[in-house]
Amino acid sequence: MTDLYYLTDDQLARIQPFFPLAHGVPRGDDRWVISGIIHVLKRGLQWRDAPREYGPHKTLYNRFKRWSERGVFDRIFTELASRDVPDQLQIDATHLKAHRTAASLAKKGIFPANIGRPKGELNSKLHAVCDGEGRPRLLCLTSGNASDFKGAAMLAPHLPPSRDLLADKGYDANWFREDLIKRGISPCIPPKRNRRQQIAYDKALYRLRHKVENMFGKLKDWRRIATRYDRCSHTFIAAIKIAAIVIWWI
């Protein structure tokens, strides 16, 4: 029992207002079911191996799948991550290896959504924007062979107001810099060597960019995040957002 994850009263109170109303047959206890889902994602378990204390494993899986499809976890993350205005933003991307159970559809001729083969292994790519404290504000998923620019283009329209945005030289593009400036955000991005006119940037400020890398490290401590087992991209990104909610927002 001591090894089981269990939502506290305060944690449950922060997310419960976003739960869908139950209709018809009463659903399983929200605290235990959500705690069980978190336990499975963090430990990297198969659903059928979930501890019995959380209830039937099918209940855990069905709740996770149904609420992922309905966007419940996405709404919780979006609401909690947008309650204040960050002074600083950081953007980056990381690869997440796809387990054979997630990639197996490719062998049947139906390629799984958001899984690609950039260099050998099949994987997905997580694009993220975090604040100056290393807390994720925006998350999106693409196939592993997608460029950083694709992720930036997907996230840029949703950037919250901020003073600065830090990014590595992979994000050095005129369109991205111009978009940030239009939003009142100052880009702190080292220029590429082949840029005709080099652009100055705040090197002292840029040293803080490790926060986004640390954020990815904490997410990958969750085994079902570090390795993708979910065939459907909407359930995998839901798992990532659940991890982000638990680690930073409740």
Regions found by a protein language model. Give the residues of each.
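Short alpha-helical elements
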Residues: 1-250
